[in-house]
């Protein structure tokens, strides 16, 4: 299948990206991953997130990326299972890291489910390292 190049993640991509995320094992969505909240995230972090489409406009890969001014974060990197192994995930990560570097962000983190062995292999191949000295703590502000 012919693939277009990496393009900016726009509001029109939200619903297709959510469908992609739901169909990819290892990607977890929460209440904070609604279309309005992703739209707000994209507006707050323009140019950091990206997608890949086919020439027909079918979304086959996506990543959400943003920063807080000090640290960057990649969320929900997903490539359609039929399109894996073609460098799409690597290209999306490269796009986001380039945008973060340009913004002067020196460090980037991801959250990866501990049972996502395929994801762990992917990130290790790209040179990412597990921080065994940290754990993620979360507090829910929603009722």
Name each model-derived stretch:
Residues 100-112:
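Conserved GNAT acetyl-CoA-binding A-motif
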Residues 124-133:
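Conserved acetyl-CoA-binding loop of GNAT-fold acetyltransferases
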Residues 79, 85-98, 125:
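Conserved acetyl-CoA-binding loop-helix of GNAT-fold acetyltransferases
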Residues 18, 22, 27-54:
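Active-site rim helix/loop that mediates acceptor-substrate recognition in acyltransferases
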Residues 1-17:
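A short beta-loop-alpha structural element at the N-terminal edge
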């Amino acid at each position: 299948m012919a693939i277009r190049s990496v393009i900016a993640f726009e509001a029109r991509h939200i619903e297709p990206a959510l469908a992609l995320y739901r169909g990819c094992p290892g990607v977890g969505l929460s209440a904070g991953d609604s279309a309005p909240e992703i739209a707000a995230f994209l507006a707050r972090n323009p140019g950091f997130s990206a997608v890949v489409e086919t020439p027909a406009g079918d979304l086959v890969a996506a990543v959400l990326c943003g920063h807080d001014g000090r640290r960057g974060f990649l969320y929900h990197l997903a490539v359609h299972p039929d399109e894996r192994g073609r460098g799409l995930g690597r290209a999306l990560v490269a796009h986001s890291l380039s945008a973060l570097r340009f913004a002067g962000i020196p460090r980037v983190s991801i959250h990866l489910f501990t049972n996502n062995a395929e994801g762990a292999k992917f990130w290790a191949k790209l040179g990412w390292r597990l921080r065994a000295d940290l754990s993620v703590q979360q507090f829910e502000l929603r009722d």
